[in-house]
């Protein structure tokens, strides 16, 4: 065996030392980075809160998140799954019951009022207590503090949840009156809502009153398409993109903005106020799909809501003075991951849908053959029995019958369970990000959320 040279001998001794030094340096660098990140997060937690964004997935209980997570993983359930944007900020759970002598499960009006005002009330009530007395909302408090305010929804903008933040009425059914109040009610001589984006055009362009004209005369821009919304930069805007609610996300055309489009547009406008802003964003139609027990439609809306939520979080990360709270006002439908005594849920059929059952049913009611519609929009190998079931349902009840039959195909194929066509009473998840997020930990009441926000708006903490 050859003797090592002096240089080789030194090299053999120094290499392990160098490796240890590099490893040690890496460990210290990693530890230092972690400490820096923790310090940055701690500093953000103590930062002044200038902006509050409340995001409500109407009807979005925990099973919807579980199903959507499975879809993000292409139907698999790996040990380390891809998380939803919500999962990263799970903070606690929230009770949703109303203060109603006849019901112990809430509707969206009572739940919205509790979330907006900190006061529980009866089902159907908008911004009033159980005796019909007006109660202040967090949006109104924000405007009183000189902040800008906004409401965004995929329902009519005067529907129950947004209305609870911006109006006061003994019944959610008085939608003309609620629309009127958006124009008529003022705080310190100013309109209390600066940005209104959603559906409901028919309630603002009426024979008895043209509210769109009044908003324009008051200095608001009025837009009706995605392109006009993006082009317009005014701080006050009324955007109405459908006569009723918007089409579901899976069915929308290029002229209709997504919930993300509307959320980003609202934030861009409201953020011009140095005093800050309050914004409520609702993914309204998770609930609507759930009332129909429509898994395809519900998942389409959860995805739309997640994209809007992600945009709000991205803004908050850069701004560092924004608190984002996402939750549901209640859950709907008794949706279950698995049914019929089988320990499986299959995301693949839901992922295969290119349009909602409602959209497909409309095409069938217009005279398109069932087989052709399902082949084009369902991307499933549909059986002859399934085709016959839709044809029979369409003959009996046209569009509604066809929609129910198509929904049944997707629910059977995915093994999705539903126990109700109405709301259910279980607690809902709360997701919080930004300074003040720790205030929403654990099990809270829906009224707690409003009371915490009231304090933040008054103190910045």
UniProtKB/Swiss-Prot annotation:
Gene3D superfamilies attached to this UniProt entry: 1.10.60.40, Alkaline Phosphatase, subunit A (3.40.720.10)
Catalytic activities: a phosphate monoester + H2O = an alcohol + phosphate
Protein name according to UniProt: Alkaline phosphatase 4
Species, as recorded: Bacillus subtilis (strain 168)
Gene behind this protein: phoA
Subunit composition and interactions: Monomer.
UniProt similarity note: Belongs to the alkaline phosphatase family.
UniProt: Zn(2+) 2 binding residues: 58, 329-330
Binding residue positions for Mg(2+): 58, 161, 282
Active-site residues, as the UniProt record annotates them: 108
Lineage, opening ranks: Bacteria, Bacillati, Bacillota, Bacilli, Bacillales
Cytoplasm keyword on record: no
One Pfam family this sequence matches: Alk_phosphatase
């Amino acid at each position: 065996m050859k003797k090592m040279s002096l240089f080789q001998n030194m090299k053999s001794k120094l290499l392990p030392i160098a490796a240890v030094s590099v490893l040690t340096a890496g460990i210290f660098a990693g530890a230092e980075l972690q400490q820096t990140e923790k310090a940055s997060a701690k500093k953000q937690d103590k930062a002044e809160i200038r902006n509050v964004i409340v995001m409500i997935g109407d009807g979005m209980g925990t099973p919807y998140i579980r199903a959507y997570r499975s879809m993000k993983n292409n139907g698999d359930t790996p040990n380390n799954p891809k998380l939803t944007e919500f999962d990263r900020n799970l903070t606690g759970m929230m009770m949703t019951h109303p203060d109603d002598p006849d019901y112990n499960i809430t509707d969206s009006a009572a739940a919205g009022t509790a979330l907006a005002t900190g006061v529980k009330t009866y089902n159907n009530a908008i911004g009033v207590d159980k005796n019909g007395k007006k109660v202040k909302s967090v949006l109104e408090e924000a405007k009183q503090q000189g902040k800008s305010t906004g409401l965004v929804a995929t329902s009519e903008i005067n529907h129950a949840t947004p209305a609870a933040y911006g109006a006061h009425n003994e019944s959610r059914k008085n939608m003309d009156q609620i629309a009127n109040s958006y124009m008529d009610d003022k705080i310190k001589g100013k309109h209390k809502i600066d940005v209104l984006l959603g559906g409901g055009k028919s309630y603002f362009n009426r024979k008895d009153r043209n509210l769109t004209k009044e908003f324009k005369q008051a200095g608001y821009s009025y837009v009706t398409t995605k392109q006009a919304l993006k082009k317009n930069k005014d701080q006050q805007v009324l955007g109405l993109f459908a006569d009723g609610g918007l089409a579901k996300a899976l069915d929308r055309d290029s002229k209709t903005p997504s919930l993300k489009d509307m959320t980003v547009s609202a934030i861009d406008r409201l953020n011009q106020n140095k005093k800050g802003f309050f914004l409520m964003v609702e993914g309204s139609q998770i609930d609507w799909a759930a009332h129909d027990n429509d898994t395809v439609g519900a998942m389409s809306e959860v995805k739309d809501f997640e994209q809007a939520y992600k945009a709000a979080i991205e803004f908050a990360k850069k701004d560092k003075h924004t608190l984002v709270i996402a939750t549901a006002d209640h859950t709907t439908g008794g949706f279950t991951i698995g049914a019929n005594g089988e320990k499986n849920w299959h995301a693949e059929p839901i992922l295969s849908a290119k349009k909602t059952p409602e959209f497909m049913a409309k095409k069938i009611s217009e005279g398109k053959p069932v087989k052709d519609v399902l082949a084009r929009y369902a991307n499933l190998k549909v059986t002859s029995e399934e085709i016959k079931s839709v044809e029979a349902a369409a003959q009996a009840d046209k569009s509604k019958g066809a929609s129910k039959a198509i929904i049944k195909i997707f629910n059977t194929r995915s093994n999705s369970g539903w126990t109700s066509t109405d709301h259910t009473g279980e607690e809902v998840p709360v997701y919080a990000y930004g300074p003040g997020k720790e205030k929403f930990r654990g099990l809270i009441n829906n009224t707690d959320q409003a009371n915490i926000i009231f304090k933040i708006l008054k103190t910045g903490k």
